[in-house]
Structure formats: C-alpha cells, structure tokens
Amino acid sequence: DNSLGLFNNINEFHSLNHNLNTSYFSYANGFFWAGCKENGLIGLKFDNNNVMQITTPSIIPNSPKRNYNFYMNIEKNGNLLIAGGGMVGDRLNYVGTIMELSNNTWSSFQEDGIKEQTGQSYKDINCVVQDPTDPEHYFAASAGEGLYEFNNKNFINQYSLHNSPLETANGYDTFVRINGLKYDNDNNLWMTNSGKDKTEGVLNPIKILKSDGKWISLRYPEIAGLNNLERTMFDKRGNFWVISSWIADYGVFCLDTKGTLEDSSDDKHKFIKNFTNQDGTILSHNGIYCITEDKNGAIWIGTGQGPIILNNPSNFFEDDFYCTQIKVPRDDGTNLADFLLANDKINAIAVDGGNRKWIGTEMNGIYLLSPDGLETIHHFTAENSPLLSNNIQSIAIHPHTGEVFIGTSKGLVSYQSDATEPEDNFVEDNVYAYPNPVKPDYTGVITITGLVQDTDIKITNVSGKLIHEGTSVGGQFTWDGKNQQGKRVPSGVYFVLAANAEGKEGIATKILFIR
C-alpha cells in the first residue's frame, strides 16, 4: 500500500507519512535508507517529535529505469532506444516503459498521465521507432492498446479502434495488438496488427501510416488472425518480412508490393510455417523468434531449435525454396557434424560491422560467430563473463563504436567489440588510432578506425620494418602493441599503412609509443 513503518520493539511502531513504493530498507551511518522503485535511494531520520522524515535528496543513478529489455535499436543519431514490454505467448502486463541512452545519459519517456488522457492502462510497450524526418518524433506499439505517438519524449496521441483503422480481435479496445514498427524508404510507418479470439480475428494484419497521415490496410489471408505477428524488417530488395512467434502458428511471411502500396493486385506474398532444409528434411522449429539480414543479403532466422539461413531470399516465393542449417564439423575424425546451436532457442540475432553474427539464446548466453557461422569466436555466459543472465532477450550494436548492448532477463550489459561498420571510402580525417599517444601505463589494445571493409593493415617502424599486419573487422582494426615476436614495441613513431582489399586505395596514419 506504498507505506513504510519501523518497529523499534514489539510494542512500538513508527509510520512514515510519505507515499513511497519501497523495495529495500536498511540502516547505516545514522540514516535509514529506502530503495524506492521510482524515486531512487532516499535517506530518512527521526525528527525531534520522533517522526521519521526524508532528510536527503533522492539519489537516482544514471541507469536504465527498469530491467526491461525486450526490444532495442540504435537510432540514426547513435542513441540506444529500448522498449520494455514484450509478449511471451500473451501480454506480460509490464508498466509502459521506453528508455533512451544518449551521450552516456539515461532518460525515460513520459509515463504519468497517459492513462488519464486515454482512459486505458499504459503498459506492454513492445516496440518503438524514431521518425526518420524528425529526431524528436516517435511511435510506440503496445500489446493491447494500439499505437502511441510521442514528441520530445512527451505523449501526444494514441491510435486505436476509435480514430484509426487499427483492429481488435475480440471487440474490446484492450485487444488492439500492434508490433513490428518499421519505416520504409519513403518514410511510411509499417506495423503488424495481430490477434484472434476463438472464431474472430484481425482481418487486415498489416497497417501502414503514410508520411502524409493517410492509413493503408493490407489483407493477406495466410497471416490474418495470427496471434503474435512480431518482429519485422525490410531487406535490401525492399521486401517486407514478418515473423509469427506463437508456438501454435509460428512462421515467416514475406511481401513484395512491387512498389504499389495502394494496389495489392500485383503483390507477391507467401507464408512458410515449416521450412525444408538443404537435405530435404522438413523442419519443426518449435517457434520462430527473430529475423535479420546480413551484409551479403542472407537472412538469419532464430527458431526454437537453432538458427536457419535463407541464402537466396529472392527465391522465397518459389515452390522449391529451401533454407540452410549450418553443419559444424565435430573435428573428431568421424567426418560427422552437428547443426549449429540446434538445442538452443534463439531469441536475438545481430550482425556487426564485420558481418559476424551475435546470437542470443534463451538459456545459454550469447555467441559471437564468424561470418559463415562455422567458428565460435566467443561464447559468453553468466558463469564466465559479466553477463547478468543466460537468458538473452535482445541485442543492439552501435555501428560507429562497435559497442554491443545485450539485454538479459536481469538487466542490460554492454561489450566493447572490435568491429564497426565499414566506411565506403578512406577519408583522411576519419582514419585515426586511439589511444594516441600510447602512454607507459597503458596495456590495452590500440584501435585504428575509419577503415573500409577488409582493409589490409601493415604497421611499420620509421625504418620501414614490418611490426604487425592483419585485416580489419568491418571498419576497425585492433593491435595489442606487440611485434611479431610477441614483445611490446619500444618508444617511437609507428606508421599504419592501410589499403583496400583490391589494393587500389590507401591511406596512412601514425601512432606514438611512449615507454
């Protein structure tokens, strides 16, 4: 009941006359300390009238407001955007949560007052996107109350049954299930509208809010009424992909509108529930949970039994289309192989600047795989790393810094990767090394950034002797500061000579070592 009291002994009770929602209470250094869910850490003391009073300002850490990490993406301006409410079969009834990390500072979108304005509970925000034409303008999808609109993090509108074509599956305005928000290249906002209740169901499962404010409703019988149309994406060809994650009606849907949004007569569309793999085996995936496209145009899909890859997604509409399950050799002399992560439920897949795959599992932590998926570069778990939990819910990678944000069931962590998005060309001001100079007490790696894909790197001393060489991972290269004999290099100036894979373009920079 948002109250706090203190027993001095079995017969004496002191009540705190403040409305605090506390989750932790202790005594230290002459203060009673209350950990409050919304107000941070607060110090309290008894006054002269033996009444407990708040005596310190609220201490709120620079951190996420809640440990809800079901959806994450990186905005165009480099900020991290998080939506805190997902669906696991059905809605979770989590308080509406949208958080942003900008310049190492956390902030949250408005929550208070939304219920009073809409007449509906504000909860289960499962997806949020930034308007590509206005960085202060956002839309957020909910698992039951439709679509919310924000400006400068403040609520401005709700779209539901009564003011838009959004549909409910059962006649109630708390069953308007929206998800999968994505903008296309023409700044039209796409979304899924899913749900069914016994015989009723949503008839038009894809909705589009055009840049001019006009709505379009698209009807495709193969996905109409499905319960959980969740993650979506546009591929390099402009096709729209949707996954259905509900275990009873899971599958993957692909749509090619031929560029005519308001004329569906020429559309190509197809829904596949159970894929056939390269061996002709029909797979039972036990659910489909995430989808992404890699640098080569292959589509990686996370299922309940490992990842599958669509190496030729342009053939998706053909009758003989098949997926690929990666076979990892056992290397035990038997010539046998195992399907990649076939025993793991895959909740999240992200592709870094080096086309490597970060794969988040339900119970086994996160894997970093080589571009082809055959090599495990890292396998981080709660037991061998700072991961807070082995249940990975979401992954987002900052394209310019390579920082990998990992949302777990117990909170958010990040890992500084050695891969960034590659540049199209070498630009003198963008190619540099850091830290520079390298001071005596520094023992970490030196990073060269601003590179193109597969840059050939040679590091020499002033006399031209080769000290180290290698190839960039995406747009970045890291060096441990050691020579080819494994010894730390002495003081001096070292030249970094960079060339593209064809050897037709090059650039140089310098690193100063102080020992």
Indicate residue ranges for each PLM-predicted region.
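C-terminal tail/sorting-segment detector
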Residues: F495-R515
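Glycine-centered tight-turn motifs at strand-turn-strand junctions
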Residues: L466-V489, N500-K504
